[in-house]
Each structure stands twice: as C-alpha cells, then as structure tokens.
Amino acid sequence: MDFISNKTPQIEAMLTEIGIQNVEELFKSIPSSLILQAPSVDDGLSEYEGIQLIESLAVRNTFPNLVSYLGAGAYEHHIPALVGAVCSKSEFLTAYTPYQAEASQGMLQIIFEFQSAICALTGMDVANASVYDGASACAEAILMSLRHHKTRRQILLSDSLHPHYKKVIEQYLKSQDCELITVPFLQEGTLDASFLKMYLNDQTAAILLQSPNFFGCIEDVQPITEMAKSQGALTILCANPISYGLLSSAKELGVDIAVGDCQPFGLSLSFGGPYAGYMACKQELMRQLPGRIVGETLDVQGSRGFVLTLQAREQHIRREKATSNICTNQALAALASLVAMLWYGKEGVKELALTNYQRANYLKFHLGKISTINVWNQGASFNEFVVDFKQDSNQVLEFFRLNGIEPGIELKRYYPSLKTCLLIAVTETKNQIQLDQFIKVCKELF
C-alpha cells in the first residue's frame, strides 16, 4: 500500500533495477538548495511509550478543571448521548454526497428533516442542506442579495456582528464589485440605527445584522427590516438557533434571509469546528439559495421519496454560473444538530432558550450591583454580555483562573479600545452554585 514506507532491501532492489547506486543519485538533477533536508527526529516509540508521552502532555492541560464562561460563537451546551449514537452509524458517518437518489434515501431524508427543522425554527419558507458554518452562511447570504438586486452594489454590515464572520465576509467580497459599509454600535452594544438610516438608500442590496449580537444584546430588528423595505433592500438576520425558542422568529420580524451557526445544537466545541451553518429564506429568493436542497416527491409506485432538487443552481451542473462553489458536505454536522433539535422537541427548545436567558441575566444582574465594574446594556441579553472591569483584562483573567474560573474572552482581541472588557457567556451548563461563585470571586477581585 502506498502509505507504508519501503524497507531498505526493497529500495536497493529498485535502485539496482534502474541502474543507480543510491537515492541521492536518483535526485542529482535537482539543485541541492531545493532539496528538503530530513528533519532531526528521534527514533520511533513503541505503542506503550507513545501512550505514556501523550498522557504526560495531556496532564499539563489544566483547562478541563476550570469552570468556563467562554462563548463568542462557540458555546458549551449539553449534547444528548443520542447524538453520538446516531451520528456514529456507518451509513451516516461514511456516506457520500447523495447524487444517486435511489441509493441515498436515508441521507436525503435526514437532510430534508434538517431543512424542515430549520424552517420550523426560523419560520422561513425554504432552507438548504447547510453550509460550512455561521460565517460562510452570512457571506453566502450577501452574495444572494447581490444576485437578487443585480444593479445594487452596497451592503450595510453591523459592526456588532461576530468579528470572525466579518473577516470571512470581507474575503468573500474581495472579488465582488460592491461597497461594504460597517454600521457602528452604540455604547451599550446595540446597532446605531441613526447611522443605518443615514447610509441606507436605493443602492443598498442588503442589511446584515446579528441578534442576539456578538455582545449578547438583543437588537430591535423589526424597525430595521421596515427601514430596509422602504428602500427595497433585503434584511439578513444572523441568530443563535436556540434563541428562536424564546424570541420572535425571523419571519415574524420581517427578515428576508435567516442565517446562523448550528453549533449550539448538538455540536461539540472541537477547537472551533467542524460546525454547520444554516440558511433559510423566503420562497421568492429560493433560486438564489446556495448549496443543496432536498425535496419530497413520489416515485412511480406513488411512494414517498426524496431527491436533490433545483440542481441547476449548483456547481456540478453550472460551474461558474452556480449560486455557490461550496463543495464540502456538512451533512454529518447537520445531522448532529437535527438529532439534538428533535431530542429537545418544540417545548424543550423553549425551555432550553429560557434557561440560557435566565442564567445569563441572573449573573449579569448581580454583577451589575458591583459599583467598581460596569456591565454593558441594562436591557435583556441572551447567553452572554460584556463587563468592563476597568483594569487590564490580563490581571482579571489571572485572578479568576487562580480561583478555578475561565471568566470570558478578552474583547481587546477584536476591539483594541475595549482592553478592559470581557465577554462572558452563560449556558444551561452553569448551575446556581457556579454562578454565585463567579459573583463571589468578582467581589474579591476589588
């Protein structure tokens, strides 16, 4: 097999066959400066020695011993055991793209059910089979709006959108003839609607905002969608899918395209991926929707069946005219999210969203009583919120870690002016004792 290296006798036999003395002679036509020098690597270890080495390295990782309040798009949620049990079935784990419908009914049904679940959450008419992640979903939604409004080349982008998402969008749009205008956020972390109104015009293809946004603030979306409609622009809403269990659906808010990351449902943190992004839209935008769409049909015997539909949009049909050049199937990650959604059910998702909301706002409320720090946005937050500790965040992190807590993410990574602020995330995995301990440590800090 080609990935098993040849032993010395085999190498010597091959060199003799072609009439040369050694391997160096085989490559003598290549300048020595271009030949990669073999790295200095120790001899191999036995299996047991290798296990000992890995375990000695793993012991140095103390993070699992900390109570983590990290969030910013990748959240610690409970993952039902059923998710792993279903996703580990070989017919899902190793399945190929279901081009051949008659041989792929199981996978096609899974994707169809995922699309149905996303439509139920968002209230939208159509959803696709997922994209890479929340960032690519945002970027693809912008491309949708540019295709829909062929002559409009302006995009208004909220600065309270996840910074990683903004970077991906900028990369996507580098080759597009369009103008990207960033709409700033107010001091409490919500979108500056007056700035938005100033730049919105008949050249605007779409407004993209996030709610709950990067800072956990719940935006007043409906007035923005109405403002966009007055100029004929589309509204793209990026949202944590769990938040729909508590907040108004995208359809109720008048949104045209709903996007986000499925990570909160059934996907482990996994160092940032792989995740799956969801995309859903109104029916009139359906033919601009990228990626695969599975439809329900009847076979020649009248039995229910599933097929890839509207394939003329896809790159394996139209190449450069396709709605997207995404070619990696995120169906396994989408399956994990689907299983989690079905495990919770409609009422369970509502309860999960309410629990996340209540626990985050409990911690936020009590931290707000500490006069030496400043909690952003006195209104409601979902999952996370910003605290200004009024001292360098490195010192704050060190103190909390000494007390067994990873308190949040330093916002100076993304916003240099916010060097004393942390973004703190609270999910259903944090109990009353842990939240009270966080408050206690925070008081001791000052």
UniProtKB/Swiss-Prot annotation:
The keyword Acyltransferase does not apply. Disulfide bonds: none annotated. GO terms for molecular function: glycine dehydrogenase (decarboxylating) activity. It catalyses: N(6)-[(R)-lipoyl]-L-lysyl-[glycine-cleavage complex H protein] + glycine + H(+) = N(6)-[(R)-S(8)-aminomethyldihydrolipoyl]-L-lysyl-[glycine-cleavage complex H protein] + CO2. InterPro entries: GcvPA (IPR023010), GDC-P_N (IPR049315), GDC_P (IPR020581), PyrdxlP-dep_Trfase (IPR015424), PyrdxlP-dep_Trfase_major (IPR015421), PyrdxlP-dep_Trfase_small (IPR015422). Its EC number is 1.4.4.2. One of its GO terms (biological process) is nucleoside metabolic process. Keywords: Oxidoreductase. The glycine cleavage system is composed of four proteins: P, T, L and H. In this organism, the P 'protein' is a heterodimer of two subunits. PANTHER family: GLYCINE CLEAVAGE SYSTEM P-PROTEIN, GLYCINE DEHYDROGENASE (DECARBOXYLATING). HAMAP family: GcvPA. Belongs to the GcvP family. N-terminal subunit subfamily. The glycine cleavage system catalyzes the degradation of glycine. The P protein binds the alpha-amino group of glycine through its pyridoxal phosphate cofactor; CO(2) is released and the remaining methylamine moiety is then transferred to the lipoamide cofactor of the H protein. This is Probable glycine dehydrogenase (decarboxylating) subunit 1. It comes from Protochlamydia amoebophila (strain UWE25).
